[in-house]
């Protein structure tokens, strides 16, 4: 298949920053920030902080008497996060894995993960680490997509469904973890305080191709025999011609320790 189908895979940091800057990204991030209720003096932990997208907003709320810790295991992400927060003296960037957080037990007032659990090996173990790191009464915010809810409008409904099925079964490790956040939080010994669902909507084909990986994941599906080559090409060409619509559900859960 031609490598010109869809946009090339962007570097992960650029992808995360662009997704966060979209209308849908800004909306759910602001909602999660409000539910997390970060206050002056709090110690805040951002697990899987990536290039530091959310660290400035957390630092602003924690104030001069608070502290923000960003944790990621990717050295390239850590470098971007350090650069982004170089002027924020109360922000510390640490290298570490979400399954074994480099944070002392019971030292955190607020913690969050954002589109991290869908990638990890054991989501329940990560939630257990968040519980360990937080103080009694602390709040933990979680946000994850449910990729089984991915809708791509097309007259070829069968191929749209095949694309979603391929995404959930072959592309994303924990593709439906979003719907299970409240259940998993309870199993980890956390008390669920709020559950919120938002629906990011894409009307611009190019933006959707960048964020949802329509072209690059379609190539994988065709190469793997999951979608017929000619039919997949026709499906993609129809999406590009428009009018375009795609959406998915993103679930946010706030828990207390």
Residues of each region from the PLM?
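Conserved alpha-helix/loop element of class I SAM-dependent methyltransferases that forms part
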Residues: 23-40, 57
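Class I SAM-dependent methyltransferase SAM/SAH-binding core
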Residues: 45-47, 51-100
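A short acidic, Gly/Pro-enriched loop at the edge of an enzyme's catalytic core
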Residues: 99-110
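Conserved catalytic/acceptor-binding region of the Class I
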Residues: 22, 139-205, 220
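N-terminal, positively charged/glycine-rich alpha-helical extensions of SAM-dependent methyltransferases
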Residues: 1-15, 26
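A short glycine-rich, Lys/Arg-flanked "PGG" loop and its adjoining helix->strand segment in the class I
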Residues: 124-139
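Conserved Class I S-adenosyl-L-methionine
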Residues: 191-257
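A short SAM/SAH-binding and catalytic strip from SAM-dependent methyltransferases
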Residues: 109-123
């Amino acid at each position: 298949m031609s490598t010109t189908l869809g946009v090339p895979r962007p570097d992960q940091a650029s992808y995360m920053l662009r997704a966060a800057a979209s209308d849908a990204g800004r909306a759910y991030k602001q909602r999660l920030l409000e539910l997390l209720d970060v206050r002056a003096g709090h110690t805040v932990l951002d697990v899987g902080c990536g290039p530091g997208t959310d660290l400035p907003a957390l630092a602003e709320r924690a104030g001069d008497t608070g502290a923000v810790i960003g944790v990621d295991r990717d050295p390239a992400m850590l470098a971007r996060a350090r650069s982004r927060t170089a002027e924020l003296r109360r922000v510390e960037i640490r290298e570490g894995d979400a399954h074994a957080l480099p944070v002392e037990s019971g030292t955190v007032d607020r913690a969050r993960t954002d589109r991290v659990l869908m990638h990890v090996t054991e989501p329940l173990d990560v939630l257990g680490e968040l519980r360990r790191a937080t103080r009694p009464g602390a709040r933990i915010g979680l946000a994850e997509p449910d990729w089984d809810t991915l809708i791509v409008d097309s007259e070829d409904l069968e191929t749209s469904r095949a694309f979603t099925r391929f995404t959930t079964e072959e592309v994303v490790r924990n593709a439906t973890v979003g719907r299970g956040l409240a259940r998993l939080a309870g199993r980890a010994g956390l008390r669920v305080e709020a559950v919120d669902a938002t629906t990011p909507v894409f009307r611009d084909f190019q933006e959707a191709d960048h964020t949802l990986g329509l072209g690059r994941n379609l190539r994988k599906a065709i190469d793997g025999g999951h979608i017929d080559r000619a039919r997949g090409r026709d499906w993609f060409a129809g999406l590009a011609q428009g009018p375009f619509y795609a959406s998915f559900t993103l679930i946010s859960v706030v828990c207390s320790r």
